[in-house]
């Protein structure tokens, strides 16, 4: 009997797929970036609930992109919308990390 993947595992897979897709395009810039999933952001930033965050490398800590699962799942109205939103959040955070526009990071950004 096949095991059913949890929603959390399926969400993690979406983040990994987006990270791999972008790492293929930006190999030199994203090779050492750590992509993570956390359930919720650490706190409110005054501008609403964050869907993701990024942090530059500091010392021996690698640069990282984090996607917050529960806020993304709350906003997505379907599985397809969730997949699109996850990818958009990953693209936005990578763009912020690299100092680029999201459309430069992924020309398909925002087209879905």
Regions found by a protein language model. Give the residues of each.
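Auxiliary, metal-adjacent structural segments of Zn-dependent hydrolase domains
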Residues: 13-66
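A short, surface-exposed helix-loop junction/capping segment
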Residues: 1-6
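Active-site beta-strand/loop microenvironment that shapes enzyme catalytic pockets
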Residues: 90
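Active-site scaffold of zinc-dependent metalloenzymes
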Residues: 51-87, 97-112
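Polyanion-binding surfaces on beta-sheet-dominated domains and ring/shell assemblies
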Residues: 10
């Amino acid at each position: 009997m096949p095991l059913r993947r949890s929603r959390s595992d399926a969400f993690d897979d979406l983040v990994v797929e987006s990270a791999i897709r972008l790492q293929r395009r930006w190999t030199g810039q994203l090779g050492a970036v750590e992509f993570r999933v956390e359930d919720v952001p650490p706190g409110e930033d005054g501008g609403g609930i964050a869907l993701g965050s990024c942090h530059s490398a500091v010392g021996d800590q690698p640069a990282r992109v984090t996607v917050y699962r529960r806020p993304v799942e709350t906003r997505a109205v379907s599985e397809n919308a969730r997949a699109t939103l996850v990818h958009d959040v990953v693209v936005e955070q990578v763009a912020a990390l690299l100092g680029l526009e999201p459309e430069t990071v992924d020309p398909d950004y925002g087209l879905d």
